[in-house]
Amino acid sequence: MTPRDRRRFDEQLDWVMARMPPLVHELIEKVPLHVEDYPSDAVMDEMGLQYIDELCGLYTGIPIGDKSVTHSGVMPDVVTIYREGILSTAADRRGEINLDRLRDEIRITILHELAHHHGLTEEDLDRLGYG
């Protein structure tokens, strides 16, 4: 990923976050948002991925409904979004990035991963249009 691509992505992420409802900002205070270029080798192996642009985001943690006192001392919940995956999803056949589509993909990915924090499954998200 070039510094220009990273900068362009981050500018659009800032644009999207500035327009998210206050509730989303409150959630991100509790479940931090990390931004990486692509998933680590460990994440790719664990998820059975072959290409770095296959994954747009990942929720790591224990969903709210599954938490109990026995989960004290575990790593904190985190939402990670991956620039390469989101840029790939927002690109047309020629590899050109449509800014509106990029913004939509960033927003959808963040909301999708926050929904996992609240216990929604991939099937639930598909039904809601956030799959």
Residue ranges and their predicted role:
Residues 109, 113-117:
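Catalytic glutamate of the conserved HExxH
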Residues 1-105, 117, 121-124:
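Active-site rim/adjacent substrate-binding subdomains
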Residues 123-131:
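Short, highly charged C-terminal tails/helix-capping segments
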